[in-house]
Amino acid sequence: MTRAGCAVVAFIAFLGFGIDAGAQSQAANMSFFVTSVGSGKGADFGGLEGADKHCQALATAAGAGSRTWHAYLSTQGAQAVNARDRIGNGPWQNAKGVVIAKDVTELHATNNLNKQTAVTEKGE
């Protein structure tokens, strides 16, 4: 992992695939959250696998653990992994039911992440 990408304790988790637009609860449709708590070891999550595991545990505690979650983090080096390639195609919806972005282009082009929309898995 790049140090810059992991310098903050809170990071973003994404569901690895799009959401169903059916009539489900907001928590059931959540496909994006900012982590509510770190690992207790700063930015050391033990690589992407550890960061994904952390996201999965938080999602499970929030009632959304039946799906696969990925941390929005990249690696560097010869076998680099780009964060945007790990999160599926969208759309992404927060725990309050707000659509953050409909696709990867919108996620990276529009500024729809702010204090009101970048909420934790608990909706806080």
Where is each model-derived feature located?
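N-terminal secretory signal peptides that target proteins for export/translocation
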Residues: 1-2
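Bacterial N-terminal signal peptides
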Residues: 5-16
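Secreted/extracellular ectodomain signature
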Residues: 21-124
